[in-house]
Regions:
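Core alpha/beta nucleotide-donor-binding catalytic domains of modification enzymes
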Residues: 1-78, 87-102, 107-110
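Conserved S-adenosyl-L-methionine
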Residues: 21, 88, 113-125
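Short catalytic/ligand-binding loop motif for oxyanion handling, primarily in non-cytosolic enzymes
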Residues: 45-49, 90-93, 127-131, 145-147, ...
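A short helix->loop->beta-strand "cap" motif at the edges of active sites that frequently abuts
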Residues: 77-81, 114, 133
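A SAM-dependent methyltransferase catalytic signature shared across enzymes that methylate proteins
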Residues: 103-120, 141-143
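Residues that flank catalytic or metal-binding motifs in active/ligand-binding sites
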Residues: 105, 117, 131-135, 288
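Flexible, glycine-/basic-rich loop-and-beta segments that form/coincide
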Residues: 128-206
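C-terminal target-recognition/interaction regions appended to catalytic cores
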Residues: 202-315
Length: 315
């Protein structure tokens, strides 16, 4: 019998499954059933472009420690496969030591005996109506893979999301700056500082060695656009309709969407020059949309919200 707080879909789709709505750090790893695939993701607040770079602390940040909970479960249960998803900034984090966080993750997976594939996938490159980039990480316990062909055609991610032939594959060892995680954490890519991460948009790691390259999606199927998935104007609720006055208001939509170079003052009184480029406004209907973020909808002006024009605006 269902209680008022129960979700009937949980019972109809998996009545005998185990659902634990609890902080994972409080769960004893031994109590987790044996499984073949661990699938998950990290909070994106530490890496996402929704925040400015100085606040993107990566795995050294408070929320980033979720990775070590995943690591704890892997260490105890040793599932054969691992599938993770995150924002693509993970490959570049943190700002002052590009690629360190991902290097620490790869090195810790190597210590547990996993071979790893990763790919940054832009949904729009495979026909979806949104330009949304995410990095997918697939790992296999004692995985046997050919590095070059795994990236280009034979890997799990390459088979699911084909790419064009690779131009160049770079390789390096994770242990160049030391063998343990502490050395990698403190020394990896330090000489490059905030200039460049060594990790390309695709790659593999096996036995502590990394092969990586820039990957371009190879897709010739149907391609959707923002205009093709919109509701018809007559079905849009009034709360989402903007009037011309709101659009033209000083420091409103046009200001927020536009490019700017201006002096600003922080809460501590420090003044600095702020600049950013323009965002297409209204959003173009003939191509995939910009990345959709939390906080869409409503009439309050925002640089990140999507605005489309159904008919000429008066005024």
């Amino acid at each position: 019998e269902l209680s008022p707080t129960d979700d009937p879909l949980v019972y109809s789709n998996g009545a005998d499954d185990i659902f634990v709505n609890q902080d994972i750090s409080l769960i004893d790893a031994e109590s987790i059933p044996d499984h073949d695939l661990l699938c998950g993701g990290f909070p994106c607040q530490d890496y996402s472009v929704a925040k400015t770079l100085p606040t993107a602390h990566g795995i050294s940040g408070k929320k980033g420690v979720l990775w070590w909970e995943i690591h704890r479960i892997l260490e105890e249960k040793r599932p054969h496969y691992l599938l993770l998803e995150n924002v693509d900034r993970l490959l570049k984090s943190p700002r002052n030591q590009r690629g360190r966080d991902f290097a620490v993750m790869l090195a810790s997976l190597n210590e547990l005996g996993y071979a790893v594939e990763w790919r940054v996938i832009d949904a729009s490159e495979y026909g979806f109506p949104q330009r949304r980039k995410r990095v997918f990480i697939f790992a296999e316990q004692n995985g046997k893979l050919n590095p070059h062909s795994a990236i280009e055609k034979d890997g799990v991610l390459a088979r699911a999301f084909p790419i064009h032939e690779l131009d160049n594959v770079e390789t390096f060892s994770l242990s160049e700056d030391g063998d343990d995680l502490a050395d990698i954490s403190s020394k990896f890519n330090v000489s490059k500082g905030d200039k460049k991460s060594p990790f390309g948009s695709g790659g593999v790691m096996k036995d502590g060695t990394v092969w990586t390259s820039k990957c371009l999606g190879n897709y010739d199927g149907e391609k959707q656009t923002l205009g093709g998935v919109l509701q018809t104007p007559g079905t849009v609720p009034d709360e989402y309709i903007l009037d011309a006055e709101a659009v033209l208001r000083q420091r409103g939509w046009i200001y927020l969407k536009g490019g700017k170079k201006e002096m600003r003052e922080g809460r501590d009184g420090f003044t600095y020059k702020y600049s950013e480029g323009p965002v297409t406004f209204p959003d173009a209907l003939e191509r995939p949309s910009r990345t959709i973020v939390t906080g869409e909808g409503g009439k309050s002006p925002s640089r990140f919200k999507h605005v489309v024009k159904f008919r000429p605006t008066k005024g």
